[in-house]
């Protein structure tokens, strides 16, 4: 005869999953072996656990509503519940019995209640100047921290965890399901102890027995000089605290260097465009340019400098990360041609143009040869 799982929990057949769980928790608190010792209470606790398992599983509940019992022999049995064994269906089912031992085959055992914490990734952005000098960044993290009330134990008192009555400490519920191969055993984590095989009889009211709570935490991250965009800084033990007060994971800070208005970075080198008057480019000169640090750096412009020429200033680039030395500053020449000429300047420029008119043009329309390269090219054509 099928068991009355609804009657065991004291709920009607139309009860919601929330009502079923609420009724189960009420009975579990009443009949838990640590609270109510004795064989009769232990049996009622086991009955309530199995009823909860059945009625919170949609497939099993459907079988109950159709008048069946999913926990009868061959229909599945939870450790510590009513059923047990594979039953005798013969055929391929017996072969699976031989491999799985007719009971606890494939068991992984309970997992530890104390688990290591997860790593945390935090992204932050800095200026190019901060990447050059190094910086300290104040960060506020929303993370899992150790519960200060129970210090990670999860218990509100000195009582130690007790063996879970649902799975008898196995940490998992084993079930037998029918398939075209016969009876196949499956297992899943125990819903009562969450797979740990033990429960806390008096859970901490602050963390609900988890040993950790969510909180905001302030930390200071040291950004080393020379860091590049996309690099990560590892801060050991600064991630999330694990369940049961387990060791914290690591914190990884991913750094993004914001674009600069003047300088462009390429590895350890810096690139910048400098405006050079055409007179200085022709005659050569020395100019003072401002570096990334704000200091004046002297740059030599050779005579005859052309547009887009690159002048290298050794050691004026970014510091090398965790190494000696700096990269270079690559100054790209942007030739500046004045547009508002006074009469004297215009007169001098015209004089220069007339003086160099014999070789200033590289190409002249008409049949007349325009320079040395034209003459050389025409020689090869003959």
Swiss-Prot record:
Species the sequence originates in: Corynebacterium glutamicum (strain ATCC 13032 / DSM 20300 / JCM 1318 / BCRC 11384 / CCUG 27702 / LMG 3730 / NBRC 12168 / NCIMB 10025 / NRRL B-2784 / 534)
Protein name in UniProt: Chaperone protein DnaJ 1
Cofactor note: Binds 2 Zn(2+) ions per monomer.
Subunit structure: Homodimer.
Cell compartments where the protein resides: Cytoplasm
Gene of this entry: dnaJ1
Domain J: 4-68
Record GO cellular component, one term: cytoplasm
Molecular function as annotated in GO: ATP binding; heat shock protein binding; unfolded protein binding; zinc ion binding
Named cofactor requirement(s): Zn(2+)
Domain of life, source organism: Bacteria
Domain notes: The J domain is necessary and sufficient to stimulate DnaK ATPase activity. Zinc center 1 plays an important role in the autonomous, DnaK-independent chaperone activity of DnaJ. Zinc center 2 is essential for interaction with DnaK and for DnaJ activity.
Alphabetical list of InterPro entries matching this protein: DnaJ (IPR012724), DnaJ_C (IPR002939), DnaJ_domain (IPR001623), HSP40/DnaJ_pept-bd (IPR008971), HSP_DnaJ_Cys-rich_dom (IPR001305), HSP_DnaJ_Cys-rich_dom_sf (IPR036410), J_dom_sf (IPR036869)
Alphabetical UniProt keywords: Chaperone, Cytoplasm, DNA replication, Metal-binding, Repeat, Stress response, Zinc, Zinc-finger
